[in-house]
Regions:
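NAD(P)+-binding Rossmann beta1-loop-alpha1 motif at the extreme N-terminus of oxidoreductases
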Residues: 1-50
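Nucleotide donor/acceptor-binding cores
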Residues: 2, 147-149
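Short, well-ordered alpha-helix to beta-strand connector turns
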Residues: 24, 55-56, 69, 95
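Short acidic low-complexity segments
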Residues: 54-68, 177
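Rossmann-like NAD(P)(H) cofactor-binding subdomain of soluble oxidoreductases
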Residues: 71-74, 78-140
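Short, surface-exposed amphipathic charged segments that create phosphate/polyanion-binding patches used
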Residues: 134-143, 189-197
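Active-site-lining helix/loop region of Rossmann-like oxidoreductase modules
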Residues: 150-256
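NAD(P)-dependent Rossmann-like dehydrogenase/reductase catalytic/cofactor-binding core
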Residues: 211-214, 220, 227-340
């Protein structure tokens, strides 16, 4: 039986822990809130079934759950990655692979600076599931699967990298392909561009005093303006990949990934994805109206820990990126003013 330690209890932490436990793994959980968790997780699937997974140990202390693990898998927001890696490195057995479900918020950069060089590292290019928590610590919804997974592995031989990819394929019941370098997972045009372009489209004219009568759906109400901005940011991102000599095609363009040809067709595609239905824009209620929620992970994660990495590398390589600059500066300014 594979022993997996999940570090983190967000949407993906719930679903991945429940899915793996329901499929024969011994799952332990490292979370800041162990008192809120049940040892039994219920995960609904798109097929209408409910998976039941039993967690063996739940703790806020790394030494309780890390030493016995055969593999560690982080499901952490970007701001927490460094502190979690610092905590687990002292109790991690030599040679045990450490991975991250989300790779685009600095995991590889932090792990390579903090963990021993003998620790294999791996990370997903895109998350394996679309996930939403229902009752924290008890139940969640698995809303969508990927048809295949791409995995980056560092600090491992080619054979060991293939072995880790094979293990992930077995664990997630999904074809898994090995990427050429961690850049192909660390850098992505998924959330850091997808979310931030839409946020800019929604609220680039927002200022204090402006409120809204309702909350728009994030994807179902997607606009051509958001698509045009996303395509422009993606073109700048592709210049960075070329400069870094990332394997051509390893990270598909936004248009290729979503099987689109232009802004209107991209809008139609994003509006029509079933797993995206019902995902609302991040807003908070003020009286009877709404304002943008600057404490949402769409702001606190995707700007300072997602787009920031792309923005930094673009400037280090002297690549003109006016659209990325515009969106990044706008988002970071709002976060600095309103997310404290």
């Amino acid at each position: 039986m594979k022993r997996i330690c999940i570090c983190g209890g967000g949407n993906l932490g719930h679903v991945v822990a429940g899915f793996l436990a329901a499929n024969g793994c011994e799952v332990t959980l490292l979370t800041r809130h162990p008192e809120r968790w049940s040892h039994t997780l219920h995960i609904t699937t798109p097929e209408g079934t409910t998976l039941e997974g039993q967690l063996s140990t739940i703790s806020s202390t790394a030494s309780d759950v890390v030493p016995q693990a055969d593999m560690l898998l982080l499901a952490q927001p970007g701001f927490a990655i460094r502190s979690v890696l610092s905590e687990l490195r002292d109790v991690l057995r030599p040679g045990i692979p450490v991975g991250s479900i989300v790779s685009s918020t600095g995991f590889f950069f932090e792990a390579m600076s903090l963990l021993p060089s003998t620790t294999p590292l791996f990370g997903f290019q895109r998350v394996p599931f679309i996930a939403r928590t229902e009752v924290y610590g008890h139940s969640a919804h698995l809303l969508g699967y990927k048809s295949s997974l791409n995995l980056a592995v560092e600090r491992a031989s080619r054979d060991d990298g293939n072995r880790i990819a094979s293990e992930i394929q077995q664990l997630f019941h999904c074809p898994t392909h090995l990427l050429a370098s961690h850049y192909e997972a660390s850098l992505t045009n998924s959330n850091p561009l997808l979310h931030t372009s839409r946020l800019y489209d929604l609220w680039h004219n927002w200022q204090e005093g402006i409120t809204y009568e309702s909350i728009p759906e994030f994807y179902s109400n997607w606009t051509d303006n958001a698509s045009s901005l996303l395509i422009a940011m993606d073109a700048e991102f592709m210049q960075l990949l070329d400069k870094l000599q990332v394997t051509p095609g390893a990270i598909p363009t936004i248009l290729d990934y979503y099987e689109s040809t232009d802004a209107p067709s991209l809008t139609h595609k994003l509006q029509s994805i079933a797993a995206f239905k019902g995902i609302m824009s991040p807003m908070e209620k003020v009286g009877t109206t709404y304002i943008p929620d600057f404490h949402s992970r769409y702001f606190t994660e995707d700007f300072p820990y997602g787009l920031a990495i792309i923005h930094r590398l673009i400037h280090e390589h002297n690549i003109p990126a006016p659209h990325i600059d515009q969106v990044y500066d706008w988002g970071m300014n709002l976060i600095s003013r309103y997310s404290d």
